[in-house]
Amino acid sequence: MKQWIAALLLMLIPGVQAAKPQKVTLMVDDVPVAQVLQALAEQEKLNLVVSPDVSGTVSLHLTDVPWKQALQTVVKSAGLITRQEGNILSVHSIAWQNNNIARQEAEQARAQANLPLENRSITLQYADAGELAKAGEKLLSAKGSMTVDKRTNRLLLRDNKTALSALEQWVAQMDLPVGQVELSAHIVTINEKSLRELGVKWTLADAQHAGGVGQVTTLGSDLSVATATTHVGFNIGRINGRLLDLELSALEQKQQLDIIASPRLLASHLQPASIKQGSEIPYQVSSGESGATSVEFKEAVLGMEVTPTVLQKGRIRLKLHISQNVPGQVLQQADGEVLAIDKQEIETQVEVKSGETLALGGIFTRKNKSGQDSVPLLGDIPWFGQLFRHDGKEDERRELVVFITPRLVSSE
């Protein structure tokens, strides 16, 4: 193909001020890329270094474009890369650059491999050495090693000085105390009137106003259960600034509530804490044709699992899992009887302030009470004593409520 070298025209647009960027008109047809780059470099009085792998031709027609834009257009069309240091312009291909980077990395790796190895021991104050070692192994050099001393919670390192310094800085950033949350809970059965006295009123709040003090968001619908005396839903509310312990004790003395349990737990950031209250019910399990039986157990417990997440500005996010498992019906089978367990489980996530109390409710029970009041002696007289006796029945509806108060524990 005929090359029109003479058609390579680089013409400066006369400028009024020297500060203005120079513009060029470039018209080339099937001209070697190296020659076009040489002409552009001479225009700016730059020294040009072209790598041996720069080849090929280019055809361009540019009119009155800035010199830098013209250079970028030529380089981009040829698939090249430029680098300017002072008045030296270097041009090479992408493949050459990748090979050069790989060669430099290989030389650095060889240099690292020849460095002398040193031993170092890092004692961790807060983090678990075993967990930290899993992530820290990636920072070791090819000849480096890391050993965990579980007894003293130390990392035993052997590597070159550069790698050890990087590891020490990384460990210092990771070995920080995690937030601790104290969880105070009260699991009670209470009637509706006493619940209102505590300032809790189950209401359906919209998303914008959910979680206000004394207001409760209904998070779930009723769950079906086997017994007719248990009704399950799920409500959640907040109580601020209350002496909850004293008020619950006072209501218990008035026989207006029963405190089932008052556990206190200490949980770390993102670590679950759980409490269970109940019993394990044994039942026999047949092993098939052999006829042998073994005893296994089913849990009939009230359980609560809380996983706290420590947030900014004294706020805590709680992931809650509450379960109420009670003995159900006795099922008849060919090899005997099996006790069913009625399960109600609720899982939710809420965000509260430190010291704010959550009220979790929605599991209802009914108690049918019957009693007799009579006048002493006279009430015991047959037939005639009915005039001096009073038979009464009371249908009491109580709700199982869990009050839980998370508080941030200072690490100082």
UniProtKB/Swiss-Prot annotation:
Annotated GO CC locations: cell outer membrane
Description of the deletion phenotype: Mutants show a stationary-phase competition defect during coculture with wild-type cells and an inability to utilize extracellular DNA as the sole source of carbon or energy. They have no defects in DNA uptake by electroporation or when made chemically competent.
Molecular function terms from GO: DNA binding
Keyword list, A-Z: Cell outer membrane, Membrane, Signal, Transport
Main location: membrane
GO biological process, one term: DNA catabolic process
Top-rank taxon: Bacteria
Localization per Swiss-Prot or TrEMBL: Cell outer membrane
Keyword Transport assigned: yes
Signal peptide annotation: 1-18
Pfam families per the UniProt record, alphabetical: Secretin, Secretin_N
PANTHER family on file: DNA UTILIZATION PROTEIN HOFQ (PTHR30604:SF1), PROTEIN TRANSPORT PROTEIN HOFQ (PTHR30604)
Function: Required for the use of extracellular DNA as a nutrient. Could be the porin responsible for transport of DNA across the outer membrane.
Family affiliation: Belongs to the bacterial secretin family. PilQ subfamily.
Name of protein: DNA utilization protein HofQ
Species this chain originates from: Escherichia coli (strain K12)
